[in-house]
């Protein structure tokens, strides 16, 4: 702009200062005004922290009562929405810089999750207040639990942006949360007690299975989880090997704690079959997804992604030593086949180890079903960058992405690919990793054939994401006994939801 609202900082501040002046004119000089603005905008030529500090001084002089320091602009979706890649409190530095320059209170925001961390940055003088948004969607009783000293009961936001953004605001529908079924669905607040307590078998201790067990037990059913592996968690356990997904541990810790506190019977290293399950009133089948094995020559030379993403840490709580298997060995130049989390997470994890990665997908678009903000940051990192405002470990060798392409033949040291124009290409690779998945419904089909009362939940029903699996489990647990649904208008016996009442005791 070249008018009085553009160019110099004073001109660019004119609009907001005139708004502040008019508010005070209408509401009185003592009417408190808070201004929220970004510490840095994270685009070429955009505002940096030095100018942000000067703006803070101008706003204080204009009579503003408090400053709330955010991050980013619309064209910088990473720092604006801060998905899983961004560490807790990453934006606190901006509030700290502003606080040193003004005497009015300063608030910080962006990926603040734990009360202990919030107390720490306030005590260190980096901020006066903390601002929470997504965390209060994941657990609206965050402050109550913190005040009561029940921080271990807080359902910590994992920054996935699936429920609150991709499947709500982005498509202009009511708010949802990937890890809290009660958000936007009041049926889950005060749960309708079971009309008849049922013996419920839940096959699979992943997201869907654990959430189903939690809700069903709260309603009064007797649940048993059958898990073939040596620990609960399912696909969540791969968070150990994929650094950007480390926040998944927060949800896994919370849901496993709920299962333990509720007294759900858990049978680890146990494979369920029709004979074992006949004694139960109902079966919820959450057996997850299985790796797609393309029928091409040499496929036996490939390895599955779940055999690569195996934790090697000693005494890892998610991968007990008893029964822990060794990860598959991979070479330096690796082809990863697939286009959902199994493939993209594997590609990122091994690229961070310095491997040269080629990601091959039959789709015409990269990762079409992955949450868009994560996808944008992932693409920046795959291209050899580190994402806007991100610090730490970048991918040193860019990940190649081949669209509209499938496997044709695998040989020792090379792979032949074929694209949608039937053009073939042979490339040198040391290892092929299969990362495409599909529902593993074999047990479900056998239970249906045997005439058992069964529901299919999670990835064994349809491969989706955390919210898809969690919602499946919660919904199934709500209708176990003759499809009873709660009437949100007649459950007013307590202001706290059923699970929060238990947690706060």
Where are each of the predicted segments found?
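Flavin-dependent oxidoreductase catalytic cores
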Residues: 1-203, 207, 211-218, 223, ...
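Short phosphate-binding/catalytic loops that engage adenosine nucleotides
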Residues: 28, 64, 103, 221, ...
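Local beta-strand N-terminus motif with an aromatic residue
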Residues: 64, 127, 280-281, 429-430
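General small-molecule cofactor/ligand-binding pocket signal
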Residues: 107, 224, 265-269, 303, ...
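Flanking helices and flexible, charged tails adjoining ferredoxin-like Fe-S electron-transfer domains
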Residues: 186-195, 218, 222, 230-231, ...
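Rossmann-like dinucleotide/flavin-binding elements
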Residues: 197-225, 267-275, 279, 286-296, ...
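N-terminal Rossmann-like dinucleotide/flavin-binding domain of flavoprotein oxidoreductases
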Residues: 234-280, 370-403, 413
């Amino acid at each position: 702009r070249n008018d009085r609202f553009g160019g110099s900082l004073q001109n660019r501040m004119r609009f907001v200062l005139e708004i502040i002046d008019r508010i005070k004119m209408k509401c009185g000089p003592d009417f408190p005004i808070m201004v929220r603005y970004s510490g840095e905008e994270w685009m070429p030529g955009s505002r940096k922290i030095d100018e942000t500090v000067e703006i803070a001084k101008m706003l204080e002089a204009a009579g503003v009562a408090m400053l709330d320091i955010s991050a980013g602009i619309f064209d910088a979706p990473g720092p604006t929405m801060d998905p899983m890649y961004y560490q807790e409190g990453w934006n606190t530095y901006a509030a700290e810089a502003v606080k040193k320059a003004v005497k009015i209170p300063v608030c910080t925001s962006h990926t603040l999750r734990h009360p202990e961390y919030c107390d720490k940055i306030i005590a260190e003088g980096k901020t006066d207040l903390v601002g929470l948004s997504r965390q209060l969607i994941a657990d609206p009783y965050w402050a109550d639990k913190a005040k009561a000293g029940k921080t271990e009961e807080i359902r910590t936001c994992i920054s996935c942006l699936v429920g609150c953004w991709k499947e709500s605001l982005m498509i202009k529908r009511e708010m949802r949360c990937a890890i809290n079924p009660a958000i936007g669905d009041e049926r889950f607040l005060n749960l309708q007690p079971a009309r008849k307590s049922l013996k419920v078998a839940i096959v699979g201790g992943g997201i869907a299975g654990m959430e189903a067990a939690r809700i069903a037990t709260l309603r009064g059913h007797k649940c048993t989880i059958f898990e073939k592996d040596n620990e609960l968690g399912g696909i969540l356990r791969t968070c150990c090997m994929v650094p950007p997904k480390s926040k998944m541990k927060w949800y896994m810790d919370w849901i496993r704690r709920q299962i333990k506190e509720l007294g759900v019977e858990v049978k680890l290293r146990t494979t369920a079959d029709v004979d074992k399950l006949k004694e139960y009133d109902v079966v919820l089948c959450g057996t997850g997804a299985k790796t797609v094995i393309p029928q091409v020559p040499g496929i036996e030379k490939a390895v599955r992604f779940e055999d690569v993403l195996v934790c090697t840490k000693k005494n890892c709580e998610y991968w007990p030593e008893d029964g822990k298997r060794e990860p598959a060995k991979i070479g330096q130049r690796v082809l990863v086949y697939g286009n959902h989390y199994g493939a993209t997470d594997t590609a990122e994890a091994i690229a961070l180890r310095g491997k040269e990665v080629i990601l091959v997908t039959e789709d015409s678009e990269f990762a079409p079903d992955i949450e868009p903000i994560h996808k944008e940051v992932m693409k920046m990192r795959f291209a050899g960058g580190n994402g806007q405002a991100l610090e730490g470990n970048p991918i040193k060798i860019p990940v190649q992405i081949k669209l509209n392409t499938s496997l044709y033949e695998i040989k020792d040291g090379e792979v032949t690919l074929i694209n949608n124009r039937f053009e073939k290409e042979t490339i040198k690779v040391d290892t092929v990793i299969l990362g495409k998945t599909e529902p593993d419904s074999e047990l479900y089909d056998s239970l249906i054939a045997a005439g058992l009362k069964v529901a299919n939940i999670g990835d064994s029903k349809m491969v989706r994401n955390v919210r898809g699996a969690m919602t499946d489990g919660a919904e199934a647990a709500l209708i176990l006994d003759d499809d009873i649904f709660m009437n949100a208008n007649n459950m007013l016996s307590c202001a706290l939801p059923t699970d929060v009442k238990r947690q706060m005791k």
